[in-house]
Amino acid sequence: MDSVEKGAATSVSNPRGRPSRGRPPKLQRNSRGGQGRGVEKPPHMAALILARGGSKGIPLKNIKHLAGVPLIGWVLRAALDSGVFQSIWVSTDHDEIENVAKQFGAQVHRRSSEASKDSSTSLDAIIEFLNYHNEVDIVGNIQATSPCLHPTDLQKVAEMIREEGYDSVFSVVRRHQFRWGEIQKGVREMTEPLNLNPAKRPRRQDWDGELYENGSFYFAKRHLIEMGYLQGGKMAYYEMRAEHSVDIDVDIDWPIAEQRVLRYGYFGKEKLKEIKLFVCNIDGCLTNGHIYVSGDQKEIISYDVKDAIGISLLKKSGIEVRLISERACSKQTLSSLKLDCKMEVNVPDKLAVVDEWRKEMGLCWKEVAYLGNEVSDEECLKKVGLSGVPADACAAAQKAVGYICKSSGGRGALREFAEHIFLLMEKVINSCQK
């Protein structure tokens, strides 16, 4: 279970390196409505994700795909599904980030060049946002680089502020790490332990550990932020589970975060169902979309052996695999691939055919996975339980999808999407066993 710890603090530290301005002030809380004005309007709580385009560690990391989803999409999904925010915003200076944010249902605040410098702090960007949005009373600054955030965490923090009267709440994680004093090079001094007695090293189970900021979020009321603080007043921390405390800063963090998010990430309100039917568009997914013609006018196509293995693995796991195409492909050519899959070609309405297959097998849409790449696949991608596209799919298909492969069509995308399905199905099985 998530645990929530609360405590007073005597100093302020900024999440992104702004120097402390001394002891945080004791704040007098007030309401905008005042007395004698009828029912007091509830304070406006806004989620704010800061996502400038000039990331130095990983270029455009905020929209780089993590486990098939733009990085910023993970926290936007959690914020939207938490149901505690009156508005959800992304503050950015970049057109591509703006487009992705809007696709996920967020509003966009175009950050000024002054607040987008390398030297600008999170606090600078938040204050600028508040200057343009007088309706906002509380800001939940959620870090885009924390993809394992869950709605329940945000719901509990909102309750701490709205119901328990805290001015600021920030996220922490418990760590069991021994710290030692740093020694300058060339100085002959011995290091000293900072949080342990080496003669009596405790076992992990005998030590409570220490709390560290994990950077997932910082909630604060407007009047506190306007005084130059994100942490202060009546202040509390919120302890997150260790498996949900993921922060991405440099390239080496990426593959580790990807495995963590697949295992512990939040995938939406609707529970995942076990996939029973996998449908793949032929041209541009199974194949690379190229058509070759032999001297005797026979059609020749190519595909990746890895994708054939992916189909075999899907079948072995009990998933029915079927192929579809809007083009009048040569069934003789396709049968020569020896994939042993039912297929339909020259299909003007793919959704109707997939719906017929689904009903034939007695399945709901959540039990169907679809890999497509064209405009003609868009409706199927929106309808199924799990949807994927190759890296080179058209823009319309990418917007409709849940997972974007790193591989291109005909070059391993099918195998990659199959492995993604296996990971998610493991998650379904584990949740059923709990």
Swiss-Prot record:
The residue numbers the entry assigns to motif BC3 motif are 269-276
The protein here is known as N-acylneuraminate cytidylyltransferase
Q: Which organism is it from?
A: Bos taurus (Bovine)
Indicate where this protein resides in the cell.
Nucleus
Q: Where is the PTM N-acetylmethionine found along the chain?
A: M1
Task: Look up the domain of life of the source.
Answer: Eukaryota
**Ranges spanned by the short sequence motif BC2 motif, renumbered to the chain:** 200-206
Q: Which InterPro entries match?
A: CMP-NeuNAc_synthase, Cytidylyl_trans, HAD-like_sf, HAD_sf, Nucleotide-diphossugar_trans
Q: Give the EC number(s) listed in the UniProt record.
A: 2.7.7.43
| Function description | Catalyzes the activation of N-acetylneuraminic acid (NeuNAc) to cytidine 5'-monophosphate N-acetylneuraminic acid (CMP-NeuNAc), a substrate required for the addition of sialic acid. Has some activity toward NeuNAc, N-glycolylneuraminic acid (Neu5Gc) or 2-keto-3-deoxy-D-glycero-D-galacto-nononic acid (KDN).
Positions of region (Disordered): 1-42
Q: Which UniProt keywords apply?
A: Acetylation, Methylation, Nucleotidyltransferase, Nucleus, Transferase
- Identify its protein family: Belongs to the CMP-NeuNAc synthase family.
Its annotated pathway reads: Amino-sugar metabolism; N-acetylneuraminate metabolism
Its domain comment says: The BC2 (basic cluster 2) motif is necessary and sufficient for the nuclear localization and contains the catalytic active site. The localization in the nucleus is however not required for the enzyme activity.
Kindly state a single biological-process term from the GO annotations of this entry.
Answer: N-acetylneuraminate metabolic process
